[in-house]
């Protein structure tokens, strides 16, 4: 019985760790979080970016990720994001950002549009990653943490 209980505790702990960075919304006013891989011809089906010549820089539109979300307000808020490198078990790798990123470590989300003629007012935010100002240098698992008002502890969504 003790053995079964200890196995269940270990499995539960590992599930909680792996779910720590699952794609999701963490704020009650944020809705419709979408992440998709796009190119000029539409949405791609592959769930990964390709490391070419030791870098992912966003210069190839077919190797970028588009993230969008809605916030239930007509007040344009200041959202930003940062990127965190993770191990294969989705735990933080411990690498410093300069070891896996070239350029800035955070970016503001300044592409937004207010809803028009809708019963519920909302603001749609979107951005693409990577881009010229933030490029990936190493392969691995990553999570993009979207936060509000420059406060990296105030995460509203993660992809």
Named regions from a protein language model:
Residues 1-24:
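Bacterial Sec-dependent N-terminal signal peptides
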């Amino acid at each position: 019985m003790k053995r079964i209980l200890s196995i269940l505790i270990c499995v539960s702990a590992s599930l909680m760790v792996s779910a720590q960075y699952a794609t999701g919304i963490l704020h009650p006013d944020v809705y419709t979080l979408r992440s998709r891989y796009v190119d000029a011809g539409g949405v791609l089906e592959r769930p990964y970016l390709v490391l070419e010549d030791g870098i992912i820089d966003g210069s190839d539109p077919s190797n970028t990720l588009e993230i969008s979300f809605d916030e239930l307000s007509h007040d344009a808020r200041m959202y930003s994001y940062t990127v965190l490198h993770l191990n294969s078990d989705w735990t933080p790798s411990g690498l410093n950002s300069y070891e896996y990123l070239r350029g800035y470590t955070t970016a503001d989300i300044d592409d937004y549009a207010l809803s028009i003629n809708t019963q519920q007012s909302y603001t749609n935010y979107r951005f693409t990653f990577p881009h010229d100002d933030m490029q990936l240098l190493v392969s691995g698992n990553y999570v993009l943490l979207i936060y509000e008002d420059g406060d990296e502890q105030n995460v509203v969504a993660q992809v």
